[in-house]
Amino acid sequence: MELTLKLLVLLLFILNHHVGSGSIVKFLPGFEGPLPFELETGYIGIGEEEEVQLFYYFIKSERNPKEDPLLLWLSGGPGCSSITGLLFQNGPLALKSEVYNGSVPSLVSTTYSWTKTANIIFLDQPVGAGFSYSRAPLIDTPTDTGEVKRIHEFLQKWLSKHPQFSSNHFYAGGDSYSGMIVPALVQEISKGNYICCNPPINLKGYVLGNPITHEDDPNYRIPFSHGMALISDELYESIREACKGNYFNVDPRNTKCLKLVEEFHKCTDKLNEFHILSPDCDTASPDCYLYPFYLISFWANDESVRDALHVNKRSIGKWERCNYLSKPYNKDIKSSVPYHMNNSVSGYRSLIYSGDHDLVVPFLATQAWIKSLNYSIIDEWRPWMIRDQITGYTRTYSNKMTFATVKGSGHTAENKPQESFIMFRRWINGQPL
C-alpha cells in the first residue's frame, strides 16, 4: 500500500512537471510531415493556488535561439487567442484557404515568419481566451491591470522553467487592443526587476501594431476617411465645424453633429474597416479572403489537434478565436499614453507601426498620441524601402521610439507579410528602417 502511494505521488509529480514545463510538439494535424521548427506548448499556473492556467505556444528562433531575442506576442480583443498571431500574422504556419470538407483543415509553412529572427511566446490571454482557463470560478471580473500582473507572473514562471532564455533580450509585442496591455506590462516588468527576490527579466523594449491607445482614437476615423476620399470635402468641413473634433462621444443636444455623423456612417458602414481596400465579405464564404478565420474553428476544435497541442482534457468547451462578446471584462486602462512616457523615460526601445489602410485605428490616431509625448525628432519623416521600392514611411524620435507605416496594410500585419517581417527584422537587429 505504501509503495503504491509513493508510486502515485511520483507519477503525479512527473505529470505536473511535464505539464508545467511544456510539451514538445513535432507533428500537427493538417500539416504534412514533421514541423520544420521547434514548437512547445503548455500551461503556466498563475496565483497562489495556480487556479488560472495560461496556455502558450513557444517557437524557437530558426536562426540562433541562444542569441536571438525572446518576444512575447499578445493578440488583441481583449479575448482573442494568440493563435491569431501564430497562424494569421507573424508565425511560421498558416491555414490553407480551401473549401472545408469535414476533415482537419490544412496547414502550410509561411515564408516571412518573425521566428526567423526571434524566439516567440504566443500567449492566450486574458484567462478564458483560447485554451487558457481557470480551475475555479473567478471571483472578480478580469481587468486590464489584473491581466498585466498575471502576464508578468507568467513570464517569471516561464523563465524559471526555461533558464536558458533568461539572458536573451526580451521584448513584449502585440497589436490592436494589446496597445493597452503591452505598455502597462513593460512598466510592470521594469518595476518588478527592482524587487529583490524575483529574477530580473532582460527587458529591452516593445513593439506594437495599430495599437488602441486612447479613448479618443475613434475621432481620427473622420479625418482619415476624408484623406482617403471616403467622404466629401463639404461633409468633412460641416462635421468638423459642428462637432469640434468630438465625433464619437457626442453631446445628445448637439443634433446637428449627430446628424452629420450619421451621414458619415452612411458613407463608410459598408466598408471593411480593418482594411478599406479589401472586400467586406462573409468569412464563411470560400471566396472571402478571410475564409481561414472560418476554418480555424474547425481546426482548433478537432480532438486530434487538441491532443497534439497537449490541451488539458475538459479544460474548456468550444474553442473560440475571440470571445470578447461572450466573456465579461473590465477595461480599466483608459489610456496607455502615460505608460509609453514612463517606458521611454526608462530607456526602453519601441517600434510603433501602422497599416495605412486601417479604419479601426487610423495611423492619424497613432501619430497624434506620439506627437503628444513631445519627443524630439531624431530622423525626419522619410520613406523606408525594400529593393528600391517604397514600402512605408518612418520617423525616429528621441527616447528610442520609432514610428513606421506599412504601405497598403490594414489593421494587422498579415496583409503585407514580407514588409512587416523586414521592418521587424531591421528594428530588432538595431538597424535603421
Swiss-Prot record:
Glycosylation sites: 101, 342, 374
EC number assigned by the record: 3.4.16.-
Signal peptide residue numbers: 1-21
BP GO annotations: proteolysis
Domain of life according to the entry: Eukaryota
Sections of the chain in a coiled coil: none
Location(s) in or outside the cell: Secreted
InterPro entries given in the database record: AB_hydrolase_fold, Peptidase_S10
SUPFAM superfamilies assigned to the protein according to its UniProt record, in alphabetical order: alpha/beta-Hydrolases
Role of this protein: Probable carboxypeptidase.
This protein's name: Serine carboxypeptidase-like 11
Organism, scientific name: Arabidopsis thaliana (Mouse-ear cress)
